[in-house]
Regions:
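A short tyrosine-centered beta-strand micro-motif
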Residues: 85-91
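A short, amphipathic beta-strand motif
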Residues: 29-36
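Bacterial N-terminal signal peptides
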Residues: 7-16
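Short, flexible loop/turn segments at beta-strand junctions in immunoglobulin-like
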Residues: 79-82
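Sec/Tat signal peptide C-region and signal peptidase I cleavage site
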Residues: 17-24
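Beta-strand signatures of extracellular beta-sandwich domains
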Residues: 44-48, 90
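Acidic, glycine-anchored loop motifs typical of Ca2+
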Residues: 95-101
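Short strand-edge motifs at loop-to-beta-strand transitions and within beta-strands
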Residues: 73-77, 129-131, 140-142
């Protein structure tokens, strides 16, 4: 009887092990994008490790770039195997999928955009230092809001 009880307890304990392992994400920077106004187009997440090209030249100067399809007005970017360091992130909702942040004739963005630390620039994009954050090599979960 004791052996049977021990067997059942062991089965119950180990039955949950694969589920708990599946829930733990690989170490990296995991970003949930908020305030996406629609599911049209894609979201581009650009991770920069230096001020060079931040944030305008995200396709050419970013350390890592992810382009994610939007589902039900939600998107998530997961950057894994990222070395320790200081980073800044820029996110663009590319509604027409032309690979750039569209603007009106005054230069004001007509598509959604956002920066880490919810950084804002005075008359343009924020500086790298305003948007930068330290990354220690462990799991980092962030949320970023888009502005239209």
């Amino acid at each position: 009887m004791k052996i049977r009880l021990f067997t059942w307890l062991a089965l119950l304990m180990f039955a949950h092990l694969p589920a708990s392992l599946a829930q733990s994400a690989c170490p990296g920077i995991h970003v949930q994008i908020l305030n996406i106004r629609n599911s049209t187009g894609t979201v581009a997440c650009a991770l920069f490790e230096s001020p060079a090209g931040f944030p305008v030249e995200y396709l050419h100067s970013a350390t890592n770039v992810m382009v994610i399809k939007i589902r039900k007005s939600q998107a998530r970017c997961d950057f894994e195997d990222i070395p320790k360091g200081t980073y800044a992130m820029a996110v663009v909702h590319d509604e027409n999928m032309n690979g750039k942040l569209d603007t009106n004739w005054l230069g004001i963005p007509t598509e959604g955009y956002g920066f880490s630390n919810d950084a804002k620039g005075l008359l343009g994009a924020p500086s790298f230092s305003a948007a930068s954050f330290p990354y220690d090599g462990q799991n980092l979960d962030m949320t970023m809001s888009l502005h239209y």
